[in-house]
Amino acid sequence: MTMNKRILKYLFFVLLVSGCTLSNFVIEKTKAPSNMIRVAILRDVDTATIKALGPYVIFDTLSGQKLAEGRGQEIFLVSLADEGFRYGDNLFKTTKIRIVAQKDDPIFVGDRCYRGDISLVVTEEKKITIVNTLELEDYLKGVVPKEISDRWPLEAIKAQAIVARTYTLYIKKQKKYPFYDLTSDISSQVYGGQGAERYRTSLAVERTQGLILFYNKMILPAYYHAACGGLTEDVSELWGERLPPLKGGACAFCKESPHAFWKQNVRLKD
């Protein structure tokens, strides 16, 4: 397919930061078998506050049974009970519940609002993990502005959107976690929900919709970071996986970063 040369230019720089070259890459527009993404937005907490802005329904995820419904605008404190969840004045005797907005209104968890559904799960450690399930492209609109400035050239933001989309699908395929695909912090990639969205970053996501990086007919492990310090590591040294595009090397692009040069003093007895 034909790609705008400016996108390729900035994509090269994004990949350079990760130690990649463009040889043997294919950028394809594809539709994933499942385009729903599950993001852990809070992990292992004791309580949380939930507020739907519009009509909503709460389901028992395990049985599919409707547990409650409301008009929205109420703030509920959620905590653990002996037999499940205490949701405001309600007791839900299940270890998994799902909150579904009826009119695409966002749902607040704490002070952040999110598109899609919100699930609450009781973990083995008797804590609450909260998961936001939403469409891939909507998820990316909450990721890209947290990983690149919306003031950067649009083609650079579009390159970042392609890399973030590729990384998302690669990590999802690994099935690392039992009931979610990624976290919302730097353990995966930073996700700020609907409240983080910006016009230019959302535009970049929309204009690159479905574009994914492949290497040797496989989704590329598109690892990336804010700054490499001037030198990227061979991916085989980090994850034991040999992948020529991620072999690492010097990165002139990051030389202007304040993190490009650093020093650490170590005592002999250490």
Positions of the model-derived regions?
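Conserved, single-site charged/polar hotspot
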Residues: M3-D270
